[in-house]
A protein has these predicted regions:
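Short amphipathic, basic-aromatic surface patches that mediate peripheral association
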Residues: 35-45
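Short coil-to-beta strand junction motifs in C2/discoidin
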Residues: 46-55
Length: 154
């Protein structure tokens, strides 16, 4: 008995691609943000930790987000980002409490921007931006410690 390897390979490839299509029809693609504020996050004038507002932006491009100052982004996001802004939402986080935030991205979204409204904004690392795939299933960890915010890898 002779095996038809090219035919077998093609059939396997079609089954694999069909499986991906089925997975997307069963569960919508999403991006999961795991926001991990430390216990000492956003200290007040007496060095006590405080709640923090996080604003998440869905962006078509990242240049205007990277170039803007904090107060323009926070107070006037539509005017500041213009057509780069696809959507945004706010999340209030508490020190030491981990948040899981799941997002179904708009098809125009290419980047996710994250802004943290720290009390001491002058000394804070308050902005992150990273690539996003509106058709994929991504998990992103954001660690927040005192006055800094950074992406973490597993």
């Amino acid at each position: 008995m002779r095996c038809n390897w090219p035919g077998f390979f093609l059939l396997s490839l079609l089954a694999l691609l069909g499986g991906c299509a089925i997975a997307n029809s069963v569960a919508d693609p999403e991006t999961a943000l795991r926001i991990e504020p430390a216990i000492n996050v956003n200290p007040d004038i007496k060095d006590r930790p405080s709640p923090l507002t996080i604003r998440i932006f869905e962006l078509e491009a990242r240049h205007s987000f990277r170039a803007a100052d904090f107060f323009k982004l926070y107070d006037e996001p539509e005017q500041t980002l213009g057509s780069d802004l696809v959507a945004s939402e706010d999340i209030a986080v508490r020190p030491g409490r981990v948040y899981e935030h799941r997002m179904s991205l708009n098809k125009e979204t290419r980047y996710i921007g994250v802004l943290a409204a720290f009390r001491d904004i002058q000394n804070a690392q308050w902005r992150l931006v990273f690539e996003a795939d509106p058709r994929g299933y991504d998990e992103v960890r954001i660690a927040i410690d005192r006055l800094t915010m950074k992406l973490e890898s597993d």
